A protein has these predicted regions:
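Basic/polar, cationic surfaces and motifs that engage anionic cell-wall
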Residues: 172-231, 331-446
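N-terminal catalytic cores of peptidoglycan-degrading enzymes
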Residues: 39-46, 191-311, 381, 510, ...
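Ser/Thr/Pro/Gly-rich low-complexity disordered regions
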Residues: 635-817
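SH3/SH3-like (including bacterial SH3b) beta-barrel domains
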Residues: 465-489, 495-498, 554-564, 568-569, ...
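Catalytic glycan-binding domains that act on GlcNAc-containing polysaccharides
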Residues: 36-182, 187-188
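Secretory targeting and sorting signals
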Residues: 1-30
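Boundary regions of SH3-family modules and the immediately adjacent low-complexity/disordered segments
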Residues: 507-556, 595-599, 605-635
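Second-shell loop/turn segments in exported
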Residues: 35-42, 50-58, 123-135, 162-164, ...
């Protein structure tokens, strides 16, 4: 059993925060010091409220409590069960004394007790309560964090305290990054917890460069723990074939092979024993191991060399293997700290070596195909159903399905990408403890990364079968390791039939059915090249390796590697999505310790070509000679109701176009307006205002589908009636200024109009009656105006607009003084 690395051990004599003792679930042993009161936290009705009460009781800032707990557990309490490294509750409190670490990450001896025991001493809560009561665990974790704090104001003063939960700089930085970015999620038991983003939080300094001897991005705590390249025994000759635990190559240079995949594994064991295995020359090696508790990374192999990790030499030749501490049958194993450091590492490797960030090239060990007939049944199934691919690819910056919305609008011939969700996707599983000891029993309601496929469109139908994974079985099962009928998030499928909410898709040589409910669709439309078999009578063979043809070995001294088809076929009438149409057909020869064997350390390339496919649960290969490749096609879409135009058909009026209705759900549209059948340059918005030049002419709009998945089909509206003259709108009425006295002059303001007028005409009014000849902008008052009220009537005009008239308010009666 591994020793968890949780940071500096909690000393029995650690400073306690002085608060009254909680009366409930108290430890029976007495204590001479005062304890943190957990009473309010224990009675909090929600996890959100419990964080607030614990913050009040301990003095730890509530956002910091949430951020630390998120990195340790994503706020899941594991239902009273131990998590990946034996911890309990949202703070992952450990039963064992953790190893102590100093600032240089060098272990040092310390008299220590477990986190559970220390939290019990600080709060008076029993160890059992701290393990099993979520609110008790929150109070205990908060008390521990408070006891680690050495004073100071502000969130930055808590960095050392945070480090004692995670031991590594990565963990501290991740906690503070979480404070900056915020998080909100619903936990496995339905609790909504929200951490509001605070961009004012200062991040701890990032490492400026990775340590020597590691291929990691700056800022990650990586250490070199090299895998040995050694003979089986010292007495063996240099040309011995008995050596381990990897092969030398030039994968990052011109010698090849190329790097095309990153394989995600779990260790099915603890960190320390796993790292020791990678150091055993008689065992096998992979490139990296990532620790669960804090995401710490150990690098074992240089990317140029070939690890022995995938169980498939072709995949080994072309891949980097990353082991994650954990067990595939344990629902709560994979920590947020592990996800984040792993994603940061993978993003770095993918960018450096040109590996696509997609689910066909960043793959699980469970996606690696067998090598020869009968080998598929022996392949691995890690990282298993509890690895959150959706979250992982979000962290990679390459979300599954991109920014497209899941849709129920699917038709035969469509290629779809499955997006399962995770926390909201609790599929039934059985046999977790037996399939992946020492995992506990499968947890009902736990999130999963797959959806089941059925043999007919019904959830009571038998699960789909996989003749390679379970030869002779007529149906898949819910057993934890049985991937026969599991389509995992990111997988691409070709739709053959649609029946209501059910999609009939091609799977392992048969038609299988995926439930895609309209109220919670699980697929996004995508584009992919596809293949169909050339022969109407002979199915295409499916391979687990893209090896060269026999003639390529001639004269090399390298034994021919037989092309052994797998248990699968592609019959006539079936279509599968292509995940890579530019594969290298090669075989890297490596059989002797010193590379002196015939053709050793040579990457032999062939002329035969293969495509990589999505097929059943895995990635497989098919010879191009046996299939036809079809370019990604946009699906057809038709207008069912033409676009319409609404709004006033007049100069200056705003016309609005509706898109009409279409046979498929379309992501968007483009618009083009026409006047008397001629395209109006630049008129490409959903709205259009006819100008003066449009007077008397008819307008129509052409709407074109703007969706990468569908053909760019267009439809036109009916033409409008001829555009009528525009109308003015008075925003501010005319006004008269000046003193209404005989001998004085009044002046007219025309007011404010929309649109602006070109001309304005004036008519002065005396008690509402036009004054003959008074048509200027000013009016001189005479004796005729004595006692009258004077106003002005303004008429505005412009080209293509109907004249408009408005009258000012009248003055007070004209006086002589």
């Amino acid at each position: 059993m591994r020793t968890p690395h949780r940071g500096i051990a909690v000393a029995v004599v650690a400073a306690a925060v002085l608060f009254p003792a909680a009366p409930s679930v108290l430890a029976s042993t007495s204590t001479t010091r005062q304890e943190v009161s957990c009473t309010a936290t224990l009675s909090a009705p929600t996890r959100e409220a419990a964080f607030g009460e614990a913050a009040t009781a301990t003095g730890v800032p509530e956002p910091l409590l949430k951020a630390v707990a998120y990195m340790l557990s994503r706020w899941d309490d594991h239902r009273g069960r131990p998590s990946s490294d034996g911890g309990y509750g949202v703070f992952d409190l450990g039963d064992r004394a953790p190893e102590a670490w100093d600032g240089a990450d060098k272990g040092r001896a310390a008299k220590a007790t477990s986190q559970i025991a220390a939290a019990s001493g600080l709060t008076g809560l029993t160890a059992d309560a701290l393990r099993r009561d979520p609110n008790a665990g929150i109070c205990g974790g908060a008390a521990l964090l408070a006891s680690y704090h050495h004073g100071g104001d502000g969130l930055s003063s808590w960095r050392d305290a945070v480090a004692r939960f995670g031991a590594k700089n990565d963990f501290v930085r991740q906690v503070y990054q979480t404070l900056r970015s915020g998080e909100s999620r619903v936990t496995a038991d339905g609790q909504r917890v929200t951490l509001t983003a605070d961009e004012s939080v200062t991040l701890p300094a990032m490492r400026l460069a990775a340590d020597a001897g590691v291929d990691c991005p700056a800022g990650l705590d990586c250490e070199p723990i090299p895998a040995p390249y050694a003979k089986g025994s010292a007495g063996e000759p240099d040309d011995t074939t008995d050596y381990g635990n990897h092969d030398l190559a030039d994968r990052t240079g011109p010698g090849g092979p190329t790097l095309d995949y990153i394989v995600i594994h779990d260790t099915e064991g603890y960190y320390d024993p796993s790292v020791r295995l990678a150091q055993d020359p008689t065992y096998l090696a992979w490139n990296y191991t990532i620790r669960s508790s804090d995401g710490h990374i150990a690098q074992h192999l240089d990317a140029k060399d070939v690890g022995w990790h995938a169980g498939n030499w072709y995949v080994n030749m072309h891949s980097i293997g990353i082991e994650h501490e954990g067990f595939a049958g344990t629902a709560a194993w994979f920590t947020e700290s592990m996800y984040q450091t792993s994603a940061t590492l993978v993003r770095h490797l993918a960018q450096k070596y040109g590996i696509p960030l997609d689910r066909a090239h960043v793959i699980g060990h469970d996606q690696v195909p067998g090598t020869v007939l009968g080998a598929t049944r022996s392949m691995h199934w890690d990282p298993g159903p509890y690895w959150d691919w959706d979250h992982y690819f979000d962290l990679l910056g390459a979300p599954i399905g991109g920014d497209l919305k899941a849709t129920a609008d699917v038709a035969p011939g469509d290629v779809v990408e499955v997006r399962t969700g995770y926390r909201d996707n609790p599929q039934p599983l059985t046999g977790c403890a037996a399939a992946s000891p020492p995992s506990p029993d499968c947890v009902t309601g736990a999130g999963t990364n797959f959806l089941p496929l059925y043999q007919s469109p019904s959830e009571t139908a038998p699960l789909a079968a996989d003749p390679g994974w379970k030869p002779g079985a007529t149906a898949g099962s819910t057993y934890a390791s049985d991937i026969s009928a599991r389509v995992v998030s990111g997988h691409k499928l070709v739709v053959a039939q649609v029946q209501g909410d059910w999609l009939g898709v091609w799977w392992a040589g048969s038609l299988a059915w995926l439930h895609n409910p309209a109220d919670r669709p699980v697929v996004v439309r995508t584009q992919a090249k596809t293949v169909t078999v050339k022969s109407a009578t002979t199915p295409a063979a499916v391979y687990g390796r893209a090896y060269p043809e026999a003639s390529a070995y001639t004269g090399t001294g390298i034994p021919v590697q037989a092309l052994s088809p797998l248990e699968y076929k592609i019959p006539a009438g079936q279509t599968y999505a292509v995940s890579d149409d530019d594969l290298v057909t090669d075989y890297y020869r490596a059989t002797t310790f010193d590379g002196s064997g015939p053709g050793d350390r040579t990457d032999l390339k062939g002329q035969d070509r293969y495509y990589q496919l999505w097929y059943a649960h895995r990635q497989v290969f098919v010879r191009t000679a046996e299939v036809d490749l079809h370019d990604a096609q946009r699906s057809p879409v038709a207008s069912t109701t033409p676009p319409t135009i609404s709004g006033p058909v007049k100069v200056g009026g705003e016309l609005s176009a509706s898109s009409g209705t279409w046979s498929r759900q379309v992501a968007g549209f483009t618009y083009q307006w026409y006047v008397d059948g001629a395209k109006v340059p630049g008129a490409t918005e959903p709205t259009y205002r006819p100008g003066a030049g449009d007077l008397g002419r008819s307008v129509l709009v052409e709407v074109t589908v703007d969706d990468p998945y569908f053909t760019a089909t267009s439809a036109r509206s009916a033409a409008t009636a001829p555009v009528a003259p525009g109308t003015f709108t008075s925003a501010q009425p005319p006004a008269v200024s000046g003193t209404p006295k005989i001998g004085r002059t009044l002046k007219a303001s025309p007011g404010t109009w929309t649109p602006s007028f070109e001309k304005a005409a004036y008519q002065w009014l005396r008690d509402g009656v036009p004054v003959r000849g008074a048509t200027g902008r000013t009016y001189h008052l005479t004796g005729h105006d004595r006692g009258a009220r004077v106003a002005v009537r303004v008429t505005v005009s412009a080209k293509a607009y109907a004249k408009a008239v408005a009258t000012s308010a009248a003055t007070r009666p004209v006086t002589t003084h």
